[in-house]
Amino acid sequence: MRKKTVCAAVLAAVVAVGGSLALASGPPKLDPTLQPYKQTSGVSGNINSIGSDSLNNVMTLWAETFSKFYPNAKVQIEGKGSSTAPPALIAGTAQLGPMSRAMKGTEIDQFEKKYGYKPTQIRTSVDALGVFVNKDNPIKCLTITQVDAVFSKSRRQGYKEDVTTWGQLGLTGEWAAKPISLYGRNSASGTYGFSKEHTLKNGDYKDTVKEQPGSASVVQGVTVDRFAIGYSGVGDSTAGVRGVPLAEKEGATCYEADPD
């Protein structure tokens, strides 16, 4: 599926950093003038990070490295979705707000109203959204229009019918009549919003989608539910699931669900 730029938001009393999301064709280039970090003195206290679950692993890695430089600084990480970041940053209960989507205009306005300046964006990494099925599922490829018809009751991509069974996607035998079990993120998630905008064309998710609090929960659900399908970052893949190759439309090239 399409790639998104994942951003970390760092908004404090002095420095404001906001999230951003954009389509990307490849990883961002490192600034050649960027100098190695130099440790300073007098850094201590507590740092709270509240925001995207998709960035939990990255935030943990950064926190561990930061603590090696500054053992007297304690970093607490809470990942419950990108939508939890702006309120926490505005309220001052968090100094870091990782987000996997762009800040909304209303969120920026609320921040500016309190602090007197707009948040600044720091782009940190690129993530790719993938569609996962159980490792035993033999599906070879899906189009974006089919994925929309599976997850959305609006079907704005224009597929010919609502898709509720695996047989409608071409599977035979024991799979043909089996209902498709749907797993996705909750509305606080930037991943939820990105999929809704780009895959569903801002249509509505089906009421049967089992909304999960985190990316790992989606993958775990698909792992234990043989007839399930779910969406998450490709980096969340485990041995229990398989990323489905995706094509933009029928007859187009199917692309593997990998970081490339």
What residue ranges belong to the model's regions?
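Flexible loop/hinge segments at secondary-structure junctions
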Residues: 23-260
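Gram-negative bacterial Sec-dependent N-terminal signal peptides
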Residues: 4-22
